[in-house]
Amino acid sequence: MPTVVIPVKELVTICREEGVDQVFVDAAHGIGCVDVDMKQIGADFYTSNLHKWFFCPPSVAFLYCKKSTNYSDLHHPVVSHEYGNGLAIESAWIGTRDYSSYLVVPKVLEFINRFEGGIEGIKKRNHEYVVEMGQMLVKAWGTRLGCPPEMCSSMVMVGLPACLGISSDHDALELRTCLRDKFGVEVPIYYRQPKDGEEGGVVTGYARISYQVYNKVEDYYKFRDAINQLVDNAFTCASLPIS
């Protein structure tokens, strides 16, 4: 999915004003990437993954449920003898699932706090660096960012040269594969369908770049140079094999 920071708190407020009873926020990239404050957001339910920006292994996540007597009929879909003991207890044990990944969270917190400013410092630096790298790329390619820097988190959408001829979701997927196989670059590519009235030379492809503490400037130079080489070779997505 394309990346942009949306005003969740304001959207929840609008939902309340419009009479929406319950609001569920699916914030897959939230924790470790943007500020997360349940009381300020005001949603009834909020979930986020800790394996994306909080340095945890896959399957570590959390689900917040606002305390309310209205949710007494809310239950986990996979439940047995704990039925009726509350959502937290009902969700505590699901068959033979491996829960060892959750045990790393205390050590992850220790690791995060080794960095200057802890998670707040990491988020700030990630944002600053990804915007800097995004601006470097659009300057090199003569394109633009997909949204203003203030609407970026630790990720940013970077316009790709129009001459690459990205004209479908399939083209975007095949170009991503090409970058991985030929240049050792892994980056999500997204197709933006032209609006009515837009003509040739329009940016239709965007790359979603991200920045984490282990990234280096050379990673982004490698991506820049790979795209430049494709452009110099007069590459277009039409030349990619049809799979």
Language-model regions: role of each:
Residues 1-243:
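Pyridoxal 5′-phosphate
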